[in-house]
Structures are given as C-alpha cells and as structure tokens.
Amino acid sequence: MENKLYVSPSPHIHGGDSISKNMYGVLIALVPAFLVSLYFFGLGALIVTVASVFFCVLFEYLIQKFLMKKEPTLCDGSAILTGVLLAFNLPSNLPVWIIIIGALAAIGIGKMSFGGLGNNIFNPALVGRVFLLISFPAQMTTWPVVDALNVFPMTYTDAQTGATVLSLMNEGVTELPSYGNMLVGAMGGSLGEVSAVALILGLLFMLWKKIITWQIPVSILATVFVFTGIMHLVNPVQYASPFVHLLSGGLLLGSIFMATDYVTSPMSKNGMLVYGVGIGILTTVIRLFGSYPEGMSFAILIMNAFTPLINSYIKPKHFGGK
C-alpha cells in the first residue's frame, strides 16, 4: 500500500514507517486501557469494543467496494483503530444497535464522505461519538456502576449511580473520588476514560516508538491545568482542583489518542502547540461554564476545523529557505 500521509513540510525522507505500522502501534498503546475497562466493566466492555470494530470495518469495506468502486484498504488498520477509539468513547452498557449507528456515522460521515483516510477533516471516532451524544443523550450519559474490587475506598456520594466525576462536579457534588481511584480507574465513565495510569502508559509507549510527539498532549494538559488551577484558586469551593480535571473525563484519552491524529492535527511543532492550547481552552470553558460537563470531544472537533488555517499560517522554514 502506498503511503500518503505526510505530516511535515518538504523535503520528505522516508523513515521506514507506514500507515499500518503507526495504526497498529496506536492499537498496542491502547491495550492497557482496554484491559482496565475489561476489569472494571467486564463483558460489556468486550461487547462494545468488538461491535464497534466489526461494524466500522464492515462499513468501510462496503462503502469502498460498492459506493467508491475502489479496492478496500482494510489492512492499513485505520478502520480498526476508529472502531476501538469510538468504543472507548462509549459507555459499556450501550445497546449494539446504537453502536452500529455510531460506527456508520464515524466511517460514513466522518471519514469516507471526505474521500477516505488522509482526506478527512474531522476525527472520525469523535464524529461518531458526538453524533450519538446528540441523537441519544440519555443512553450516552448513563454509565453502569463500576463492578470490581476497588483498590482505594470509594466514598463519594453517587458511587452506586455510576456517575462520572465531571457529572458530579456539574451537579455541585463536592465529595469526589479519591485520586487513587481516578488513577486506577475505579469510577464511572466511558470505556477509555476511567484509568489515567493505563492511558499514560499508552502515551509513554507512543513517545518511545515516536508514533506521536509531545507537543499536542502536553500543551492540552498544561493549558487545562493552568486555567482550572486559576479558577480553583479564585473559588476552591465552586471549582475543583486542576488535578481532578486532569484525571477525570476524556481529557487524557482525547489529548493522547484523539487530538494527535495525523490527518486532523497541524503539521508543524508550533502549530501543534497552538492547536493544543486551543483545545485546552475550549475544554476548560465548556467544563466550567457549559451545560454539558465534558467538552473534550467538541474542543477537538472545533480545532480540527482550524487545522488547515493553522497549517497555512504556522509552518516551519522550508529546507534551504531564509
């Protein structure tokens, strides 16, 4: 398969990496988070993930084969990765028929309507998530109770409702999960949102393998930390600690695995920093002042739209240029 994704200005030197190698590298990085979701959510996590991957692959095959009249490119792993990332943005008790709709939105609208891999403007998995969130808000915001032996005692008020940390904060609850529970994943949430440790392990693996660079995740996390920290200092009763924001919701999942998508993020390092700061600001504003407790998905999609503009104004000096 030919390689079409270039994420830096010319000249281009082939580094030995391929699309499929990077895609499967990201999938390996997601394994720790998947294992944690299996531990805490059991069979539901497996069903959601398998269904999401299967239908994402199926829809990509059907669209490429019968609508686009081209040879399917399933071996590159992009449809599998989209399916896993979509599943990681879903609750473990979501009905399969809703997952099918999400997979169709992710692949059909978010990816193939733009021409396929390398041409899409928005992150396909997030297109699927937001489509489901708007279409089925009740099902998308109902999480099962965590059913596993908790390493750290759960003392917060709504432990038996499966509520997420962000929804608790949005409702004004001050007794939140311990940092220990947020680190290991003993709290309500979507499959890929529950364990900070597992996600950070994935980040370290991708940095080690040079699948991604540090600019986007670090700029997002630093921006959220700074602005939520300022608000916490101003009013610690109303606004939670910045550490709570870092460890809860989809912030880590989004900043590590979603915002770093090659196709929908800027090419230059400075552009990545601007992009990451933008995501961090939008996420903070939505979390603190919006009616919906989590803003990561919306923030990434909004900044995806600005990526072409960032690329046109912020780019490194061309080789040999002045």
List the model feature ranges, each with a label.
Residues 1-57:
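N-terminal signal-anchor module of multipass membrane proteins
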Residues 1-24, 288-322:
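Cytosolic-side transmembrane-helix boundaries in multi-pass membrane proteins
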Residues 85-152:
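Membrane-interface helix-loop-helix junctions at boundaries between adjacent transmembrane segments
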